[in-house]
Amino acid sequence: MAIEGVMKEGFVTTTYDSVVNWAKTGSLWPMTFGLACCAVEMMHAGAARYDIDRFGMLFRPSPRQSDLMIVAGTLCNKMAPALRKVYDQMPEPRWVLSMGSCANGGGYYHYSYSVVRGCDRIVPVDVYVPGCPPTAEALLYGVIQLQQKIRRTNTIARA
C-alpha cells in the first residue's frame, strides 16, 4: 500500500483505491474447484508446510462466500456448465486462477473428444499456473501474482 504522506499529528494520507485494494489482497477467500490430481497439490498448499492462510486466504465451501475460484484439473464437457454456474454465483469482484496443464489447455487429454481445451473457454481466467501437477510453491506464486494484479487495478478512480 502506497502511503503518500505522514503528517505531524500521526495522520497518514493515502488514496481510497490503495486501501480498498490492500484489503482485497489480504482477504482472498478461494473456492476450490478440484477436478483431478492438481487438487491434491492445492490441499498441500493449505496444509501446515505451505500454509496459504498466512496470505489471508480461507477456503470456502460456497461460491456465494468466495471471491476467488481455483480451477485445478481436467475440465470435461459435462462439467463445463457446472463450472460456469458456480462462477456466476460468485459475488463481484471475482477472480479465477487456472491451476495445471489440464485446466490451462487440456493438458495430456488435449485431443480427447470430451475435454475442454482450457477453462478460459468457459470463464475468464486471471492467472495461469503451469505444471503437471504444479507444486504448492507454484500455486503460492500464482496467488502472489494475483495479489499484485489486484493492487494495480483501479477500484474507485477510473483512468
Curated annotation (Swiss-Prot):
<feature type="binding site">
    <location>
        <position position="37"/>
    </location>
    <ligand>
        <name>[4Fe-4S] cluster</name>
    </ligand>
</feature>
<comment type="similarity">
    <text>Belongs to the complex I 20 kDa subunit family.</text>
</comment>
<comment type="function">
    <text>NDH-1 shuttles electrons from NADH, via FMN and iron-sulfur (Fe-S) centers, to quinones in the respiratory chain. The immediate electron acceptor for the enzyme in this species is believed to be ubiquinone. Couples the redox reaction to proton translocation (for every two electrons transferred, four hydrogen ions are translocated across the cytoplasmic membrane), and thus conserves the redox energy in a proton gradient.</text>
</comment>
<dbReference type="InterPro" id="IPR006138">
    <property type="entry name" value="NADH_UQ_OxRdtase_20Kd_su"/>
</dbReference>
<protein>
    <recommendedName>
        <fullName>NADH-quinone oxidoreductase subunit B</fullName>
        <ecNumber>7.1.1.-</ecNumber>
    </recommendedName>
</protein>
<feature type="binding site">
    <location>
        <position position="102"/>
    </location>
    <ligand>
        <name>[4Fe-4S] cluster</name>
    </ligand>
</feature>
<keyword id="KW-0520">NAD</keyword>
<dbReference type="GO" id="GO:0045271">
    <property type="term" value="C:respiratory chain complex I"/>
</dbReference>
<feature type="binding site">
    <location>
        <position position="132"/>
    </location>
    <ligand>
        <name>[4Fe-4S] cluster</name>
    </ligand>
</feature>
<keyword id="KW-0408">Iron</keyword>
<keyword id="KW-0997">Cell inner membrane</keyword>
<dbReference type="GO" id="GO:0005506">
    <property type="term" value="F:iron ion binding"/>
</dbReference>
<dbReference type="GO" id="GO:0005886">
    <property type="term" value="C:plasma membrane"/>
</dbReference>
<keyword id="KW-0874">Quinone</keyword>
<keyword id="KW-1278">Translocase</keyword>
<keyword id="KW-0479">Metal-binding</keyword>
<keyword id="KW-0472">Membrane</keyword>
<dbReference type="GO" id="GO:0048038">
    <property type="term" value="F:quinone binding"/>
</dbReference>
<feature type="binding site">
    <location>
        <position position="38"/>
    </location>
    <ligand>
        <name>[4Fe-4S] cluster</name>
    </ligand>
</feature>
<keyword id="KW-0813">Transport</keyword>
<dbReference type="InterPro" id="IPR006137">
    <property type="entry name" value="NADH_UbQ_OxRdtase-like_20kDa"/>
</dbReference>
<comment type="subunit">
    <text>NDH-1 is composed of 14 different subunits. Subunits NuoB, C, D, E, F, and G constitute the peripheral sector of the complex.</text>
</comment>
<dbReference type="Pfam" id="PF01058">
    <property type="entry name" value="Oxidored_q6"/>
</dbReference>
<dbReference type="GO" id="GO:0051539">
    <property type="term" value="F:4 iron, 4 sulfur cluster binding"/>
</dbReference>
<keyword id="KW-0830">Ubiquinone</keyword>
<keyword id="KW-0004">4Fe-4S</keyword>
<keyword id="KW-1003">Cell membrane</keyword>
<dbReference type="GO" id="GO:0050136">
    <property type="term" value="F:NADH:ubiquinone reductase (non-electrogenic) activity"/>
</dbReference>
<dbReference type="GO" id="GO:0008137">
    <property type="term" value="F:NADH dehydrogenase (ubiquinone) activity"/>
</dbReference>
<dbReference type="GO" id="GO:0015990">
    <property type="term" value="P:electron transport coupled proton transport"/>
</dbReference>
<keyword id="KW-0411">Iron-sulfur</keyword>
<dbReference type="GO" id="GO:0009060">
    <property type="term" value="P:aerobic respiration"/>
</dbReference>
